[in-house]
Amino acid sequence: MTPKTIYTYDQAYEASLKYFDGDELAAQVWVSKYALKDSDGNIFELTPDDMHRRLARELARIEARYPEGMTEDEIFELLRGFKYVVPQGSPMAGIGNDMQVGSLSNCFVVGLDGKPDSYGGIMRIDQEQVCLLYTS
């Protein structure tokens, strides 16, 4: 595996600011939440195009299993510029990210059968949450 380029926050922010036509909030949010990072906070994507390429690469890997699956470039064109497909936040950060373990879901529903407002009910809900987030 070839080493990835590590960017500073300022490098990614400036490149993203240009990508988002000067929208400071969009650039800050993208770098802070969605740019590929390792568990030490090192940034490996300069702009959302890098993220879209990562997503397209991973989705194309799955598509290759099907007779008429889409190619990486076809998927990238749908994602590029947030024009046709805009993934939710957790998938944008997590798909193709082999540096951190994270959820690809933005929402979980935890059951509330019985008496949820009791020690036993609270412990059962905690146990369900641990099971949802456990990684081995």
Protein language model regions, located:
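Extended catalytic cores of very large enzyme megasubunits
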Residues: 1-136
